[in-house]
């Protein structure tokens, strides 16, 4: 276990659920990225995720990572949508397999192409099963995902159990950036029962109540992204952090 994973697990002993802020490297300039990251850390975020589901530029990602690291002290974790999102300078990477993709490229081939760069750049790899829930979002389209229906928690649990048996230490349930509704608590609970690792939930979480429901259902971390980039209030982010942070 690397330093970033150890830090996150240590924080989980103090907080019920962690908050991760997602910054899309394609839509953020230096000032906005730094302002968002600085504000997210002040609001109570435990880590900054940098990435996106569309195609990106490695040099641009590296620049944004450097800008964010200058402005914050919390870990910066890459969340790449493709091999071009593997860039130097970050503290770690969600080394993910999109397990319910219909395209083998996103299950194992992109990982094989990106792995040498992860090693070269000295990135801490966080082995992650990435599961797309529902349909109609960018990640569903770009990743050729066979989206798990929102009302089918047992399917998500089966994938998560497979991830556990494959040795993955993280599962990320992704409703998608800007999703109309978040992952349902029933699905989070089912996955929590099947998977004893670090459970991340993202997509469609826009307020304290949605965050609280995900936390109470068993999420170890929730991801907030679109709300911030759309001009969402950092005060609201702070309230979300407060709603999920109780031990």
Curated annotation (Swiss-Prot):
State the needed cofactors, names only: Mg(2+)
What Gene Ontology molecular function terms does this protein carry?
Answer: imidazoleglycerol-phosphate synthase activity; magnesium ion binding; phosphoglycerol geranylgeranyltransferase activity
InterPro entries (UniProt xref): GGGP/HepGP_synthase_sf, GGGP_HepGP_synthase, GGGP_synth, IGPS_HisA/HisF
Identify the GO cellular component terms for this protein: cytoplasm
**Residues the record lists as binding sn-glycerol 1-phosphate:** 172-178, 203-204, 225-226
- The EC number on file is 2.5.1.41
CDD domains named among the record's database cross-references? PcrB_like (cd02812)
Which Pfam families does the protein's record reference? PcrB (PF01884)
Query: What does the UniProt entry say about where the protein is found?
Result: Cytoplasm
Q: Give UniProt keywords alphabetically.
A: Cytoplasm, Lipid biosynthesis, Lipid metabolism, Magnesium, Metal-binding, Phospholipid biosynthesis, Phospholipid metabolism, Transferase
Q: What does this protein do?
A: Prenyltransferase that catalyzes the transfer of the geranylgeranyl moiety of geranylgeranyl diphosphate (GGPP) to the C3 hydroxyl of sn-glycerol-1-phosphate (G1P). This reaction is the first ether-bond-formation step in the biosynthesis of archaeal membrane lipids.
Q: What is this protein called?
A: Geranylgeranylglyceryl phosphate synthase
Organism, by scientific name, is: Cenarchaeum symbiosum (strain A)
């Amino acid at each position: 276990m690397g330093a970033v994973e150890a830090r996150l697990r240590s924080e989980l002993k103090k907080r019920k659920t962690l908050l991760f802020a997602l910054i899309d490297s394609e839509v953020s300039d230096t000032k906005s990225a730094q302002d968002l990251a600085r504000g997210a850390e002040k609001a109570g975020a435990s880590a900054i995720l940098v990435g996106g589901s569309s195609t990106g530029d490695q040099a641009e990602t590296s620049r944004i990572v450097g800008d964010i690291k200058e402005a914050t002290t919390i870990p910066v974790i890459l969340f790449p949508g493709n091999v071009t999102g593997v860039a130097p300078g970050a503290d770690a990477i969600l080394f993910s397999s999109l397990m319910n993709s219909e395209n083998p490229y996103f299950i194992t081939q992109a990982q094989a192409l990106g792995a040498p760069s992860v090693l070269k750049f000295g990135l801490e790899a966080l082995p992650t099963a990435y599961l797309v829930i529902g349909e109609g979002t960018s990640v569903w389209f770009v990743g050729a995902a066979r989206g798990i229906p929102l009302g089918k928690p047992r399917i998500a649990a089966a994938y998560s159990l497979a991830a556990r048996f494959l040795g993955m230490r993280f599962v990320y349930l992704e409703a998608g950036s800007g999703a109309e509704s978040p992952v349902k608590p029933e699905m989070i609970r089912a996955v929590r029962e099947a998977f004893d690792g670090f459970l991340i939930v993202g997509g469609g979480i826009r307020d304290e109540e949605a965050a609280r429901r995900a936390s109470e259902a068993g999420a170890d971390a929730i991801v907030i992204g679109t709300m911030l980039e759309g001009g969402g209030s950092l005060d609201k982010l702070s309230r979300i952090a407060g709603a999920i942070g109780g031990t």
